Amino acid sequence: MSTVELNTSAGRIVLELNDAEAPKTVENFLAYVRSGHYDGTIFHRVISDFMIQGGGFTPDMQQKSTLAPIQNEADNGLRNDNYTVAMARTNDPHSATAQFFINVKDNAFLNHTSKTPNGWGYAVFGRVTEGQDVVDAIKGVKTGSSRGHQDVPVQPVVIESAKILG
């Protein structure tokens, strides 16, 4: 299992990544970490009873360029439970690139149920092993609208650095 540390303006979060169950997703995430993609990005979507999403925007809400989308691995048996990390995507099940989210409660409706557009779900590829208190603090920040986006923290929550620990 790979481990990644996110140093954020709200504190430190450590993610344990499940290479065995989500190999393509983990390799994709690690490629973004290695390239420095996440450094200086924000948690741009925060919904207190759902999830916190980041990895795609700068503090001034400029979207970062990404690599090609990856195949959805949501059929790996991992569940969108509290403190798990999963890939964000559009309505296309196979559109995930760099953005990810941390579930802040059990979100069973995001789990894979079938290989159909509505059943694919969202690929879980890891979990928070340290910094659950930081995740809880982030989910409680005040949010508003910014540049056409909803649920954006009024005070940016910045991922100052992301690094591979092991």
Swiss-Prot record:
GO CC terms: cytoplasm; extracellular region
Entries under SUPFAM superfamilies matching the protein: Cyclophilin-like
PROSITE patterns, sorted: CSA_PPIASE_1, CSA_PPIASE_2
Main subcellular location: cytoplasm
Keywords: Cytoplasm, Isomerase, Rotamase
A Pfam family matched in the record: Pro_isomerase
Enzyme superclass (EC): isomerase
Subcellular location: Cytoplasm
Known role: PPIases accelerate the folding of proteins. It catalyzes the cis-trans isomerization of proline imidic peptide bonds in oligopeptides.
Subunit comment: Monomer.
Protein name: Peptidyl-prolyl cis-trans isomerase cyp18
